[in-house]
Amino acid sequence: MRPSEYICLCILSAVCSLAVSPTIVAAFPTNTQHDKPSRNAEQRTAMIHDLFTFSSADTVVAWSATDDRVMGGISRSRMRFYAGGYALFEGVMSLEQNGGFASVRAAVKPPPLAGVTHYVVEVRGDGKRYKLSMRTAGRFDAVSYQSTFATVADTWTTVAIAVNTFVATFRGRRVIDAPPLDAAKVNQVGLMIADGQDGPFQLAVRRMSVEAQ
């Protein structure tokens, strides 16, 4: 192969690799509080706004549980603070009595950034799947925009979830004619476990933020 042909192939390969990007951008190990996940050049230039940094006990006061007990189930959950600098979403999810979800939520001010592209969470999970949820209406029982993310058991990870992956739902069912999530109108954020994953669960959360380009 001539040098010029090799260079052309390299350029073509690079262009193709840039054309595909995952919807959930990354899950980087961050095994200590001071580790920072490596990002590509585009991500490093993003503007970041923290929604929650769980550095003190008062940071979890605004969070409240909403479990399947509202529909006759027996699941239970809570959000509590740990002195290590994180909050813990924990409880027991049960499928009995037509149940099947546990969640916590908190009011939040819309981010002062235009063009939000991702929601970012620093978490230590138990290997189960969780949902990050957003609401834009002021009502308690309103459309919820949800996106699912995986966790790695006993390992701190940073997960960036693209805004365009959030799906509109109402009482567990998809809302087909709902508009896309508008990050500028989000006034409530939540965490949920569902999808038949019964049993005890624990999700430690150190930080929740938004990114904008």
Where on the chain are the PLM-derived regions?
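Bacterial N-terminal signal peptides that target proteins for export
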Residues: 1-11
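Short, low-complexity intrinsically disordered segments enriched in A/P/G/S/L with frequent Arg
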Residues: 4, 16, 38-41
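Beta-rich carbohydrate-recognition modules and glycan-binding surfaces
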Residues: 24-213
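Bacterial N-terminal signal peptides
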Residues: 9-22
